[in-house]
Amino acid sequence: MVLIGQTLQAYKGLSTEQLLLFVKALGFESCEINPAGTSLNNVEKIISKVGKMKLTFHLPIQGIEGYDFSQEDKADQINNVISLINNYGEKLNLLLAVVHPPEGNGNIEVLVKNLKKLNIPIVLENVVWYSNEEFKEIYEKLKIELGDQLKGWLFDVAHSYLRNGRKHYLDILDLLPFSELEEIHLSDCLEGEDSHYAFGAGILPIDEILREIKERGYNKIIVNEIDAHPTIWDVIDSYRKVARTFKKKLYRKVTFRLAITKPIIQAKLKKNKII
């Protein structure tokens, strides 16, 4: 059965643990966290809030944390993330970790060395700066190097759309083994920009995307990798849209809780000058 999540990191003064309470109150069933919002400094607070919710963990990337697992000169930061996952992963209910192929001056041997230190399954995400064929080559190399630790691959729809265009953004689903597709990232984007917008704020044909992955029988993890743009409420509506497509019961649950909690949440956000 599909597990539907939402990316969480600090937002306008709200910590990850505060946002976790927010999405739990709305009935969200899963979240994806990252080092930008989850560290050794606040992990105990997050654990106290997570309850039975299942989480995934996005390993650091240069665009957010300023480094990734393929950089030898970032050993201290990388080891902190490894320690976080290995020591607290079970208490965080972590299912898997998401990794990008090497960026910039990154080295794939360093990436492999660091990934092997993690006590958690790994999925490899397609990115804009690699062609489908290059991504497949790296994926197959990691399958050899990591063995069963590499659980599968992740399809980031916006990344593929920006790289391959309107006609070919779904081609990767036929190039790599669909049975090994373990996670999908959804968000809207602008032309030439990986915007992480809510659905409808950019150029992606989200209805077509949802229809395609449902018709293919996809039944694993979907994460809305969406920032609060245009508004927090658009993020919630995007989550409801995915739930309505794949899990009607979850859609009804979130819709009902939104009707009850929206005035309370709105008042708290206004009090903190967030909206």
What are these regions (language model features)?
Residues 7-11, 34-38, 60-64, 102-104, ...:
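Active-site beta-loop-alpha junctions enriched in small/polar residues
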Residues 2, 29, 33-109, 159, ...:
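Structural motif corresponding to the early beta-alpha repeats
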Residues 54-66, 127-128, 152-154, 252:
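Short, basic, helix/turn surface patches
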Residues 100-143:
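Hydrophobic, well-structured mid-protein blocks that either form specific transmembrane helices
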Residues 6-7, 68-72, 126, 196-197:
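Short, contiguous strand/loop micro-motifs
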Residues 6, 11-43:
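Conserved N-terminal beta1-alpha1 strand-loop-helix module at the mouth
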Residues 1-5, 13-24, 78-86, 90, ...:
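Histidine-acidic metal/acid-base catalytic patches
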